[in-house]
Amino acid sequence: MQKLHREICGPVGLVPTMGYLHEGHLSLIRASKKQDLNTVASIFVNPTQFGPHEDFKKYPRDEKRDMAMLENAGVDYVFAPSVEEMYPPGFDSWVEPGVLQERLEGAVRPGHFRGVCTVVAKLFTIICPAKAYFGQKDYQQYLIIKKMASDLNLDVSVEMLPIVRESDGLALSSRNTYLSASERKAALVLYRSLLTAKSLFAAKEYNPEIIRRKMTEEIQRESLAEIDYVSLSDQDTLGEADKVSIKTIALVAARFGKTRLIDNMFLA
């Protein structure tokens, strides 16, 4: 792939994925192509970002389907390495993020962002993109990768695009395929809780305790939902907000049966 990069004329746009693509991924590809970049999509289910009791083995995979979608989307190149290629025997060098990983997903999934940063740093090194595209749904991941690129002087612009949702508001996720019909219906409560926060802020409610409580109560009304966290965080630091403002982002995570989903929304 590094040899191939030297043969590509012009800057590269990278869309890193774990496969089982959906419209959210395709929106990232369209953003890259709109900027006249040679667009590379990577497909790699990264084992090092999964915990020992998480869903690495059952994570949905369908390479034939993904390749057809990428071809239809006009992707110029696909990088789909094996685990052995990315982590050869004896591999023992890691990118460890700092304080941005300590809350939210990092607290619930220890070691997750070390795996994410390591694999993304390797992708940046292999593919040498001018721009890399990530979705807002994984907002903490986006901030951490952007910080990593800046701290390590990686010559890549890390871009974020808005969450793509189903018509009823459910954020698109490859893991949605795990949901039963009743769990999928229940999962809409995450979106409703975020709308509750946004509505309260629009009505000039700036007390984070009140907004968090209302969000939590909304989710708790759904019997199939098991809350991991409800947060009102600073958009830049991810510190919990003392007062809600235009710089606040609401983030939620919950489990529906065996499926864990996350979502977020800017309040302004």
From Swiss-Prot:
GO cellular component, one term: cytosol
Main location: cytoplasm
GO terms (BP aspect): pantothenate biosynthetic process
Binding locations of (R)-pantoate: Q49, Q141
Pathway membership, UniProt: Cofactor biosynthesis; (R)-pantothenate biosynthesis; (R)-pantothenate from (R)-pantoate and beta-alanine: step 1/1
Catalytic residue positions: H25
Binding-site positions, beta-alanine: Q49
Swiss-Prot/TrEMBL catalytic activity: (R)-pantoate + beta-alanine + ATP = (R)-pantothenate + AMP + diphosphate + H(+)
Function, as annotated: Catalyzes the condensation of pantoate with beta-alanine in an ATP-dependent reaction via a pantoyl-adenylate intermediate.
Sequence similarity: Belongs to the pantothenate synthetase family.
Subunit structure: Homodimer.
Stated name of the protein: Pantothenate synthetase
